[in-house]
Amino acid sequence: MIVYIEKQEIIWLQNFVTKYFPRPKVDEIIRKVIPEEDFIKYYKNAKNSEMSKGAGFVTKAEDYAIPNSSNELIESLRLDYSGTKFSKDKGFVVIEYKNPSPNVEHPFNTSQSTNRLPYTNTGMTGSKHNIIPEYHSSDIVKFDVDDVVRVYDKNGKIIESYKIVEDNITKEKIWKKQ
């Protein structure tokens, strides 16, 4: 069942979110969730240590616990949008990194404000079970030392973990399996 709310109610919710859920500060730990296949294609098998984390929707790490399964992740973060690569039958990847940018915004203050459902335009996910503040980064940011990537199977178990470290000899930033 889809419930529609009035424009004034959305504005009230946006003001509430702006006041009580401030944008991530520089150096605050944020999370980006990506499909496992994207991690393999763009990160794990890439030889370019300067590969970007990309832009898009992110959350503060402190705002939620990693879900116990792909199914729970999809529901909690509302990753069930049209064309999604996320599936209850596949694993997922969580990238945790220090926010390098002062430009992470509430999504209703960005071009994302016209997205279709399940996007709510309130700054919160639209899950039936929980509400998680969400933000949008339009900056393409690079991986840096101490950024962490964890690969989860469909049951929410960590199967691989990586950290960016600086090579002592070449001084290049490299993935190191933990």
What function would you assign to each model-found segment?
Residues 1-8:
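Hydrophobic, membrane-inserting alpha-helical segments
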Residues 10-178:
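Catalytic toxin/effector domains delivered as secreted proteins or via bacterial secretion systems
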